[in-house]
Design a protein with these regions (language model features):
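Acidic (Asp/Glu-rich), glycine- and aromatic
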Residues: 90-105, 199-240
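A short, structured loop/turn motif at beta-sheet edges
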Residues: 85, 163-170, 199-202, 270, ...
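Short acidic, Pro/Gly- and aromatic-enriched capping/linker segments at domain boundaries
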Residues: 27-39, 60-79, 258-268, 328-337
């Protein structure tokens, strides 16, 4: 699939009441205009904006927002930048499936754990997995094992980008992905759309749309959106997981970890200051006898979090949480709808990276905004 480097058109919206200018992003291909309205809006209230083609002066031009999003493609990853900071990296080659890591919170540390760290090393970053533990014959693109009992596993293969676009409000990529089973046979064709944007430096968002064109696998075919929370959060001893259902994590009932929720949030401290630069040769590996393992400092530093929102239009909403997961991981399972067991079907999720815990960051309200957004009327 040929890649399109789509240039976003910058326009401005002038708010009727305050006269302030707000930057907007117009996509000529879809005919859609996107902008972030500053401040908060109470339910039932309204605001008026007038579309203008140019700002009066340069100072007026950048009133809001001041964080355009830039996507930069490398050979194996996409760097997502705002305010000259790479705050998210989408690794689309080199693993069994694409994933985000690092994903920086406002404190400057990643709110998700990287690859090969600690227990369950296949719990990597943030991304979509598939198949679970191969129940009823579904392919396993989850455990990352080559051998039994959880292998051999399949892969999600990057086939190309249909679109990579940067802009004053958001950046977006559209990707073709094919899933193959352990024997290299294609089983799923997917078109993945990821939109990246900031409301403020303390509120960062990733919007996902997974369009499953066809699914030719056996079994229940679970699509698993997963977030492995940062080790520094020290969940559940220090950090915490909260959710719309009010379900305790970890559960007070041994073995009972499944629940349904429209949103789930994990938050905790981002750790102490970074370790000093190494003084030994890089060949001194931490797994050699007598080597000193770098100290990992928990319950220190500013508190950040990450929330996952389910969308009411998804089949089975609110979807099941906790399958194939430990307390330190958020996993939400989506299944093909009965009327399209082999596709096509689509499901959507939003990720909210924030300062503070779920209550301080208004996670429940942001989830409600995602489920029932503002209505926009355009008048000539």
């Amino acid at each position: 699939m040929a890649q399109e480097e789509r240039a976003a058109q910058t326009l401005w919206l002038r708010e009727a009441e305050s006269g302030a200018l707000n930057v907007a992003q117009y996509d000529p291909a879809s005919g859609r205009l996107a902008f972030v309205a500053p401040g908060a809006m109470a339910a039932g209230s309204s605001r008026r904006f007038t579309l203008v083609a140019a700002a009066r002066d340069r100072q007026d031009e950048v009133r809001h927002p001041d964080h355009p999003v830039q996507l930069t493609q490398k050979l194996d990853r996409i760097l997502i930048q705002a305010q000259e900071q790479t705050w998210a990296t989408y690794n689309y080659l080199g693993g069994r499936r694409p994933y985000f890591w690092p994903l920086l919170g406002p404190a400057g540390a990643s709110v998700v754990r990287g690859q090969g760290t600690g227990e369950h090393p296949h719990h990597t970053g943030l991304g979509l997995s598939y198949g679970g533990h191969s129940e009823e014959g579904s392919a396993n693109i989850w455990s990352d094992w080559d051998e039994p009992p959880y292998g051999p596993g399949g892969r999600m293969l990057h086939r190309g980008f249909r679109q990579l676009s940067s802009g004053p409000v958001y950046g977006q990529l559209v990707q073709d992905v094919t899933y193959v089973d352990a024997y290299g046979e294609p089983i799923v064709d997917e078109v993945r759309t990821i939109r990246c944007w900031w409301a403020t430096a303390e509120a960062r968002f990733l919007d996902f749309e997974f369009h499953i064109q066809s699914c030719r696998d056996r079994g229940p075919q679970p699509f698993l959106f997963m977030i492995r929370l940062a080790t520094s959060m020290a969940i559940p001893k220090v950090g915490r997981v909260s959710n719309a259902a009010g379900y305790p994590v970890p559960s007070s009932k041994p073995g009972d970890r499944l629940y349904r929720a429209g949103w789930v949030d994990g938050s905790g401290p981002m750790g102490g200051p970074p370790p000093p630069p190494p003084t030994a040769a890089p060949e001194t590996l931490v797994d050699l006898p007598g080597a000193k393992v770098p100290e990992q400092r928990h319950d220190e530093g500013p508190w950040n979090g990450i929330a996952l929102f389910d969308h009411p239009a998804n089949h089975g909403f609110p979807a099941m949480v906790g399958k194939y997961a430990v307390s330190q991981q958020i996993t939400q399972a989506h299944y093909p709808p009965p009327d399209a067991p082999h596709g096509p079907f689509t499901f959507r999720q939003r990720v909210y990276v924030h300062a503070g815990d779920a209550e301080a960051a208004g996670v429940a309200q942001h989830a409600a905004d995602y489920a029932d957004p503002c209505r926009v009327e355009v008048r000539g």
